[in-house]
Amino acid sequence: MTDKQIEEEIQSKNLNAPRLTPEIIESKIKKCEFHILTEVLTVCVITLENGFTVTGESACASPKNFDKELGEKISKKNAVDKIWMLEGYLLKQKLFEGKNNE
């Protein structure tokens, strides 16, 4: 299931509490770079709007299976998944602080 499909299901179920969306996550990305470090390893380095960086990796066991485009897609997805975790923590902290300040 893609992020877009998940978002559509969330909306169809009218789940409207504070949450992250794929658009929010994408809006945090300032720059995305790819580096091929060996015959089998692709690294995605994402710089966020605040300057923090996250990385994602993709590797295959055999150089015969290496595909640049596929490596970039997988490594970016892995890096973006880390942004979801970071932003999820930040949102939870903001909700916690708001609850404790009431």
Task: List the predicted regions and their residue ranges.
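Domain-level marker for long, solvent-exposed, non-transmembrane regions
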Residues: 1-102
